[in-house]
A protein has these predicted regions:
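Conserved HGGG/HGGXW glycine-rich cap/lid loop of the alpha/beta-hydrolase fold
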Residues: 9-61
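Active-site loop/oxyanion-hole signature of alpha/beta-hydrolase fold enzymes
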Residues: 41, 50-90
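Conserved alpha/beta-hydrolase "nucleophile elbow" surrounding the catalytic nucleophile
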Residues: 91-96
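Flexible "cap/lid" loop of the alpha/beta hydrolase fold
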Residues: 97-105, 110-142
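Active-site nucleophile elbow and catalytic-triad environment of alpha/beta-hydrolase enzymes
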Residues: 164-180, 186
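Short beta-strand/loop motif that positions the catalytic acidic residue
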Residues: 184, 190-192
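Conserved alpha/beta-hydrolase "acid-adjacent" motif
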Residues: 197-204
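Catalytic active-site module of serine/aspartate enzymes centered on a nucleophile-bearing elbow/loop
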Residues: 215-247
Length: 247
């Protein structure tokens, strides 16, 4: 896996396919850049898809603490290191929060946004769910195995960092997407399924859609939050049409 030095740390990333660059952000505790290589090779090979691991997670060195803005600054610095001036960003869940903040803080770097199954804001219920699901001592064996697969033997350290990062007040404020949606200038496609759930509420997608002036909202019937993994051919076809029509 390639590694570049950004902001004083080494940042791992994958680069898949050929063609115009596209940045993909997922960035959760139960995945990594390597998880998405096969998917991108199969469904997004018309692009050169850049998939980073964020500071403190997956293939990167563990850190005891970081600021939420570090994840955005590191992503911007990665694009600079790869000599990518501006790029469409496809993101899901936590990655959507990083992507929107990147578009607001570094508008020249983001030519378009695609937000799949986004999480728009923090809430106490979500923080409690995350702590129950992923913290050592409460995570079930299936979740531990998933974290071990992508975070390695230091999964517990990564999980504690991930959960505590989400519980910071600075995280909640910085990544409050409805509060900053009006500052997004990039054309934006929001996708999700119509089956609601507490971790990825439909209301989060509609709130961001209402705030971003140049946005499309696509809701797939009889589908859970993640359209990309449930209907990959349809998702990437829609992404291609969106990027073509808004270029």
């Amino acid at each position: 896996m390639p590694n570049v030095q950004v902001n004083g740390i080494g940042l791992n990333y994958e680069a898949v396919g050929s063609g115009p660059p596209l940045l993909f952000l997922a960035c959760t505790i139960d995945d990594s850049a390597t998880k998405w290589v096969d998917h991108m090779e199969r469904y997004a090979s018309d692009y050169r898809v850049i998939i980073p691991d964020v500071r403190g997670l997956a293939g990167n060195a563990r850190v005891a603490d970081a600021e939420p803005s570090d994840w955005v600054a590191d992503t911007a610095a990665l694009l600079d290191a790869l000599d990518i001036a501006s790029v469409p960003v496809v993101a899901e869940t936590l990655g959507s929060r990083i992507a929107v903040r990147l578009a607001v803080d570094h508008p020249g770097k983001v030519s378009a946004l695609v937000l799949n199954g986004l999480i728009a804001r923090s809430n106490p219920e979500g923080d409690a769910w995350r702590r129950q699901m992923f913290m050592p001592g409460t995570a079930n064996p299936e979740n531990i195995e998933q974290m071990r697969l992508f975070q390695g033997d230091t999964w517990a350290e990564a999980a504690e960092f991930y959960v505590k990062m989400h519980e910071k007040e600075s995280f909640r404020t910085y990544f409050d997407l409805p509060a900053i949606a009006g500052d997004v200038r990039a054309p934006t496609l929001i996708t999700r399924g119509d089956i609601d759930d507490a971790a990825h509420p439909i209301e989060h997608s509609t709130a961001v859609h209402a705030g971003v002036a140049a946005s499309w909202l696509s809701v797939h019937p009889n589908t859970s939050f993640n359209v990309m993994t449930n209907h990959p051919e349809e998702f990437w076809s829609l992404v291609g049409r969106f990027l073509s029509e808004t270029a």
